[in-house]
Amino acid sequence: MKIYTLHAKQNLPISREQAWQFLSDPKNLKVITPDYMGFNIQAGADRTMYAGQIIEYIVTPILGIKNRWVTEITHVVDQEYFVDEQRFGPYALWHHKHFIKEIEGGVEMEDLLHYKLPFGYLGQLAHPFLVKPKLEEIFEYRKNKLVELFGSM
């Protein structure tokens, strides 16, 4: 079974502190997720991010099918990076690293996502036509939303 990778970088004209304050609040995930995803946090977003935090969502990632998604924040280094891992949800594996690096005039935000699909060979067949384009669309939406909120470099 194949493990896929999605890698994205974005520069924003804000401080590392501002970027961290926004990203470390789980409630802001709804802000940067397309409305059609039906994203709603069910539990676990009442505090800023910490290692061991469990966050439960309802999300409609593909074909209008509602999914319960549970992630754990497994690693946090204040104002540098955090990792979220799916504990229950639509993927066989979901390991998402978020990095923040100070650069001249702002920050570089980097996402490194490793994921595996369920359903073996059928999942692999669906990847290039359904899953990969949807994930790329979601990450592009996030990129545009962050520019709308914070400006561009």
Listing of model-derived features with the role each one plays in the protein:
Residues 86-137:
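Beta-strand/loop substructures that line and gate deep hydrophobic ligand-binding cavities in soluble
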Residues 5-7, 66-70, 93-96:
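Short, surface-exposed coil-to-beta transition loops
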Residues 7-13, 40, 58, 72, ...:
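Generic structural detector for well-ordered beta-strands
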